[in-house]
Amino acid sequence: MPFVPHSPEDVSVMLDAIGVNTIEDLFADIPAEMRPKSFALPKGLSEMDVCSRLEALSARNRTDVVSFLGAGFYDHHIPKAVDALSSRGEFYTAYTPYQPEAAQGTLQAIFEFQTAVCRLLDMDCANASVYDGGSALFEAMMMAVRATRRRKLVIDEALSPIYRTMLASYTSNLQLELVTVPHRDGLPDMDALKASVDDTCAAVVVQNPNFFGAITDFTDLFTHARAHKALGVISVYPVMQSVLKTPGEMGADIAVADGQSIGQPLSFGGPYLGIMTCTKPLVRQIPGRIVGRTQDVDGRTGYVLTLQAREQHIRRAKATSNICSNQALCALRSLIHLTLLGPEGLVRTAELSMERARYAAERLTALPGVELLHDAPFGNEFAVRLPVSAFEVVDRLTARGYVPGFPVGRYYPGMDNVLLVACTEKHSFEQVGILAEMLGGIL
């Protein structure tokens, strides 16, 4: 419905009703010198003018490019039913369901989401989501700090640099000791990580697959951490969890993920959702909403928000986090996506993505001067070292309609010639072949 502003007559009637002469009188309690002299806003536009302006801006978008970008965010196919079901008014307008008697549908959907992600990651408990993968990782670190009463955190440098930047920002005033262990050609340095985990450490924080696409089994590292009474925290890629060793199998205490790859379009970076799971002993440390299943006095199944004493709206001073919202709609989309695909469909999505990535790696490394950054297993994403600048390659091929990947040197000094290439089930073998031919033409 278009916004229809108040007419001068409407404003006059409202001012008369509340007993003032002008709108400025409403702010009489604020000293004049503290009020802004001008808001420096342009003149308002009509609805037609606004639509024309937005259409002109949207026309500048490139929708015809073939993109091999990844770096933590992936263009997987989203079944049309996800949009159709999640846009229903019963879900689309719902927020945190504080009144369970009026929101059983939403509460059950969140409960099923929690169940689904626990099964996917092989963990005991989950919350109703947080904002994104980075905020989930920060909250996981703070869970470890509270649970262990320690302030040292060991972080693998191969963890997403986007997440590491967020963690540095979040923790800048928390008097925590963040120890970043350098990677070795895109691989975690296991010996150095173990050496950094001691009796003062709250948690070791890793990612699988990591930013460079490398797949690693962290079972030994988590066992080592447990021997020092530290926690194992891992960030994972949900789609790949259908075929990889799970956090639960590795012995992780807390597992988080960005849920973008299951049901969320890339959409200029959001909205996404942060998935948080943990082992049962840590459930009272997990932030945000948790939906539980119970029975009413008549024996009927009901869904409620449970363990609310952890939350800010109940005990502000002692809450586990100041997060006071969640991504319920995005969580619903992820639930619908997972349900529509089922276990076999999710495995097939991962296998097709990995198949394309293997083919891409073979084609690209057949070019002169191109080699894989490391020889570790990878899933749907891999890094290659080029004989020229990756930034130059990205600029030249993007201008021709192909985004070849992500230039790793943007975040890692000394790696300007490293290109990170991601594939999903949406990429065809023909597109991969064209990428290889275009890259070969400029090397």
Curated annotation (Swiss-Prot):
<comment type="subunit">
    <text>The glycine cleavage system is composed of four proteins: P, T, L and H. In this organism, the P 'protein' is a heterodimer of two subunits.</text>
</comment>
<dbReference type="InterPro" id="IPR015424">
    <property type="entry name" value="PyrdxlP-dep_Trfase"/>
</dbReference>
<dbReference type="GO" id="GO:0019464">
    <property type="term" value="P:glycine decarboxylation via glycine cleavage system"/>
</dbReference>
<comment type="function">
    <text>The glycine cleavage system catalyzes the degradation of glycine. The P protein binds the alpha-amino group of glycine through its pyridoxal phosphate cofactor; CO(2) is released and the remaining methylamine moiety is then transferred to the lipoamide cofactor of the H protein.</text>
</comment>
<keyword id="KW-0560">Oxidoreductase</keyword>
<comment type="similarity">
    <text>Belongs to the GcvP family. N-terminal subunit subfamily.</text>
</comment>
<dbReference type="InterPro" id="IPR023010">
    <property type="entry name" value="GcvPA"/>
</dbReference>
<dbReference type="InterPro" id="IPR020581">
    <property type="entry name" value="GDC_P"/>
</dbReference>
<protein>
    <recommendedName>
        <fullName>Probable glycine dehydrogenase (decarboxylating) subunit 1</fullName>
        <ecNumber>1.4.4.2</ecNumber>
    </recommendedName>
</protein>
<dbReference type="GO" id="GO:0004375">
    <property type="term" value="F:glycine dehydrogenase (decarboxylating) activity"/>
</dbReference>
<dbReference type="Pfam" id="PF02347">
    <property type="entry name" value="GDC-P"/>
</dbReference>
<dbReference type="GO" id="GO:0009116">
    <property type="term" value="P:nucleoside metabolic process"/>
</dbReference>
<dbReference type="InterPro" id="IPR049315">
    <property type="entry name" value="GDC-P_N"/>
</dbReference>
<dbReference type="InterPro" id="IPR015421">
    <property type="entry name" value="PyrdxlP-dep_Trfase_major"/>
</dbReference>
<dbReference type="InterPro" id="IPR015422">
    <property type="entry name" value="PyrdxlP-dep_Trfase_small"/>
</dbReference>
